[in-house]
Amino acid sequence: MQAATAYPVARYMDFFDYVPASEIPGVLNRSSILLQLANTFASDGPKGFMTTKLFESMAVGKPLLCVKSDESCLEATIRNTHSGLAARTAEEAFRFILHHYQFWQDNGYTHINTDKEAVERFSRKKQAVQFMRIFTRLNSK
């Protein structure tokens, strides 16, 4: 909140206290653009941090903006699922926001055409099936 008040953007933002997990899909569906905060790590630093927030965001079909791109797994997943943009520059983020803002002005909502099959691979149901296959295979050894 402090960072938002340092710039003239606070009036465009909603801040939530604790939100129960059961309410998260509703919050995401009421949002216009979903924000995923990340960063580019040093070449010897950690890579591939993908939180459940990412997968929940991809599932609702709203534009997903990741700032700053991790230039790794997160960026590749967003690109491969067509769920938004992992911005490497402020200009990229600006163009993404402007595009979806103009769509919102014209239509009253935002949407992005994700690759639903690619997103579905990350669902809890699909992951549970994958784990069951692994455990079944291990059990047969």
Locations of regions flagged by a protein language model:
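Short alpha-helical segment that forms part of, or immediately flanks, the ligand-binding pocket
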Residues: 25, 47-60, 75-76
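A charged, aromatic-enriched C-terminal amphipathic alpha-helix characteristic of glycosyltransferases
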Residues: 88-91, 105, 109-138
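Short acidic active-site motifs
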Residues: 22-23, 53, 92, 96
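Acidic donor-binding loop of glycosyltransferase active sites
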Residues: 28-47
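Short hydrophobic beta-strand element within catalytic cores of glycosyltransferases
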Residues: 33-36, 56-68
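Hydrophobic "lid"/C-terminal helical patch
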Residues: 4, 97-101, 131, 135
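Nucleotide-activated donor-binding/catalytic signature segment of Leloir-type glycosyltransferases, i.e.
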Residues: 1-25
